[in-house]
């Protein structure tokens, strides 16, 4: 069984940290290989995983659009692009990274988009788990992954602003008509109880809260030191909470 989890949230809420923590927990459970897809133009998932990508899908698309009419005779566009796409995958130990980069501009080419979507959907089937770290607008999710999303995890901190954004993200997912089997909310960087305003905004989202992750000083220090998530101690409070949350989610997936 292949599992695809998409993570989305307002910038600064900790969605990339959550994605990296989930990847670590999945790897520790032996649910490998894992494909980590950084679909946020402000890409930093690779840094959290200690993987470095020099080439993004956005860059490949731009280059292909420039070359599409000058390919050698007898070389199909699909073969050329799929070869280049394979070069963009950064292979790690049990975890591979693919960076989406910036979305296409006005030079959009439908044949290229079709090949990209087909390739990415085929690629996911080669992995036990795929984690998609998305930007709030989920542009890449809508353009590149049309189906097969098992779980959409929307991330928010305790601020009313972030919770309103979480509700809007859920609405965007509806508007895009994405095939998502289940969606939920994870609260991050918690320091005590939610305010009355935050509770009101939370209720408006209509989302099930599946995780409440407290502020973790060790994670904060890790980020300041520019160190990967694997350097986090096994006793870290955030890792413990994400591990327990993931167990609950996986149990529900198995029962579905």
Residue spans of the language-model regions?
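Conserved catalytic-core segment of NTP-binding enzymes
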Residues: 111-212, 221
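Cytosolic-facing regulatory segments adjacent to core modules
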Residues: 79-87, 91-92, 96-132
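Short, hinge-like loop/turn segments at secondary-structure boundaries
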Residues: 51-55, 172-173, 200-204, 228-230
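Walker A/P-loop phosphate-binding motif and the immediately C-terminal alpha-helix
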Residues: 3-41
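Beta-strand->loop->alpha-helix junctions that form or flank phosphate-binding loops
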Residues: 58-59, 210-216
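Active-site signature of alpha/beta-hydrolase-fold catalytic machinery across serine-
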Residues: 21, 25, 48, 144
């Amino acid at each position: 069984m292949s599992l695809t989890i998409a993570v989305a949230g307002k910038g600064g809420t900790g969605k990339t940290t959550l994605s990296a923590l989930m990847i670590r927990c999945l790897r520790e459970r032996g649910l490998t290989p894992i494909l980590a897809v950084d679909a946020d133009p402000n890409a930093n998932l690779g840094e959290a995983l200690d993987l470095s990508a020099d080439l993004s899908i956005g860059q490949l698309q731009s280059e292909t659009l420039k070359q599409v009419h000058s390919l050698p005779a007898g070389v199909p566009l699909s073969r050329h692009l799929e070869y280049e796409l394979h070069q963009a995958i950064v292979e790690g130990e049990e975890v591979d990274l693919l960076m989406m980069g910036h979305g296409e501009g006005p030079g959009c080419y439908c044949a290229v988009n079709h090949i990209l979507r087909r390739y990415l959907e085929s690629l996911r089937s080669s992995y036990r788990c795929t984690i998609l770290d998305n930007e709030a607008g989920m542009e890449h999710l809508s353009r590149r992954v049309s189906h097969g999303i098992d779980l959409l995890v929307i991330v928010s901190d305790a601020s009313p602003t972030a919770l309103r954004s979480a509700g809007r993200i859920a609405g965007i997912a509806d508007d895009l008509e994405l095939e998502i089997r289940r969606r939920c909310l994870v609260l991050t960087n918690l320091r005590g109880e939610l305010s009355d305003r935050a509770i009101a905004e939370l209720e408006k989202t209509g989302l099930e809260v599946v995780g409440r992750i407290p502020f973790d000083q060790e994670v904060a220090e890790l980020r300041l030191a520019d160190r990967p998530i694997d350097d986090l101690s096994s006793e870290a409070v955030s890792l413990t909470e994400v591990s327990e949350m993931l167990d609950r989610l996986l149990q529900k997936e198995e029962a579905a």
